[in-house]
């Protein structure tokens, strides 16, 4: 199946079928993304080393955590208070086996979660805000659970930033968040022919 999985999950319109696709892909997901040069862990590491300064016990939400590839890098950096949230039970099983999360939650970001408001020092959402997955409205939910003065780190493909309403949703929430930095474009999966150019968007939640 290999490289076809990415096209399948990004073009799927049904959330039920999307969950089934990830169930079927879960066992090979890590190997596939590593083979494709998965860039988000490195991008997140750069941000946490250069753009924002947080303590190693900071409470971090890995929103749309999948199998925990980004959290593995966080763990290597000695962050020890990571909460993972994902829609796929099968992806979460693999994430749990890595023993790098303090807690794992099976929920969708496409609607309001059960997470308490204003609780995370950092909210990460990489490779999730995209076609076939989670739309722009989820940005409101990600802001809601971020602490005052906490950080929101999002990856968004350039091709959908305006087209799918992410630019508009971020601008509508300017009263809640201030821009820290937007990265230079990078290819999220450089070894996959379908990969798009993305940017990392870093915001800080304003005092409420």
Place the predicted regions along the sequence by residue.
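A short glycine-rich, Lys/Arg-flanked "PGG" loop and its adjoining helix->strand segment in the class I
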Residues: 137-148
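N-terminal, positively charged/glycine-rich alpha-helical extensions of SAM-dependent methyltransferases
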Residues: 1-27
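A short acidic, Gly/Pro-enriched loop at the edge of an enzyme's catalytic core
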Residues: 113-123
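Conserved beta-strand signature within the Rossmann-like core of class I S-adenosyl-L-methionine
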Residues: 149-157
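Class I S-adenosyl-L-methionine
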Residues: 177-208
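Class I SAM-dependent methyltransferase SAM/SAH-binding core
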Residues: 61-112
């Amino acid at each position: 199946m290999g490289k076809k999985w990415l096209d399948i999950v990004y073009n799927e319109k049904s959330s039920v079928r999307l969950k089934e696709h990830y169930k079927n892909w879960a066992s090979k997901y890590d190997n596939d993304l590593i083979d494709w040069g998965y860039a988000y862990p490195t991008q997140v590491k750069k941000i946490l080393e250069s753009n924002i300064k947080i303590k190693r016990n900071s409470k971090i939400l890995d929103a749309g955590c999948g199998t925990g590839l980004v959290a593995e890098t966080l763990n290597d950096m000695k962050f020890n208070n990571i909460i993972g949230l994902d829609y796929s039970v099968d992806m979460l099983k693999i994430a749990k086996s890595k023993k790098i999360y303090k807690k794992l939650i099976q929920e969708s970001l496409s609607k309001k979660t059960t997470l308490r408001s204003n609780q995370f020092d950092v909210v990460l959402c990489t490779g999730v805000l995209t076609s076939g997955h989670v739309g722009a409205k989820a940005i409101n939910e990600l802001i809601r659970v971020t602490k005052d003065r906490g950080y929101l780190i999002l990856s968004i493909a350039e091709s959908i930033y305006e087209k799918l309403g992410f630019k508009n949703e971020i601008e509508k929430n300017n009263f809640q968040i201030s821009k820290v930095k937007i990265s230079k474009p990078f290819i999220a999966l450089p070894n996959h022919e379908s990969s798009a150019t993305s940017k990392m968007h870093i915001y800080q939640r304003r005092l409420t």
